[in-house]
């Protein structure tokens, strides 16, 4: 499946630039714009430093999760971007990658973005997909919730790939990542 003409369904925030350290914390909840963007336009938003999250119906919180068709994984340690790019799963399904604002040469930090084959309209399903991909890549465990903010990085030059997760793989991820009752 090719992402070239697939729209990314997210919310963006043009006033949260890079890591937004300090400043007005109300921006984390308010001011999000629900958009549908071609993957190249989404990459441009990230390259402007703009934050993104799932679309919301109101302020940004899990109870207001509306929909999304991507899952993002923060890699803060354990592998380099080059290692991630050569991973067989990424070779088949990775849609976009970029270095995060916290990236430094001695400790590479980057974000993997996977476009999904359909809209996720349930916060529980979004968490399941996020959880499964975080398990697969040993991603930052604090980034699994459905209303998570992902910060852009001005001048990060995101790399876009013409591939995405398939329906079959999405079903597997939903099964792997679903909450377990103990």
Each language-model region and where it sits:
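Generic beta-strand structural signal
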Residues: 108-110, 148
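Catalytic "initiation/cleavage/transfer" segments centered on a nucleophilic residue
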Residues: 1-44, 118, 133-182
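Signature for HUH/AEP ssDNA processing cores
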Residues: 1-108, 115-128
């Amino acid at each position: 499946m090719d992402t070239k003409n697939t729209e990314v369904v997210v919310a963006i925030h043009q006033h949260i630039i890079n890591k937004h350290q300090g400043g007005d914390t109300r921006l984390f909840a308010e001011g999000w714009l629900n958009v549908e963007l071609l993957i190249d336009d989404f990459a441009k938003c990230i390259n402007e430093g703009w934050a993104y999250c799932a679309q919301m119906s109101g302020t940004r919180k899990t109870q207001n999760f509306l929909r999304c068709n991507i899952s993002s994984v923060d890699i803060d340690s354990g592998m380099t971007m080059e290692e991630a790019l050569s991973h067989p799963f990424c070779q088949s399904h990775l849609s976009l990658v970029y270095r995060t604002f916290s990236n430094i040469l001695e400790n590479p930090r980057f974000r993997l973005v996977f476009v999904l084959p359909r809209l996720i309209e349930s916060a529980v399903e979004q968490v399941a997909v996020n959880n499964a991909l975080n398990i697969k890549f040993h991603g930052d465990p604090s980034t699994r919730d459905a209303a998570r903010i992902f910060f852009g990085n001005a001048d990060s030059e995101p790399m876009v790939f013409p591939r995405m997760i398939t329906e079959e793989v999405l079903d597997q991820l939903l099964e792997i990542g679903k909450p377990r009752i103990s």
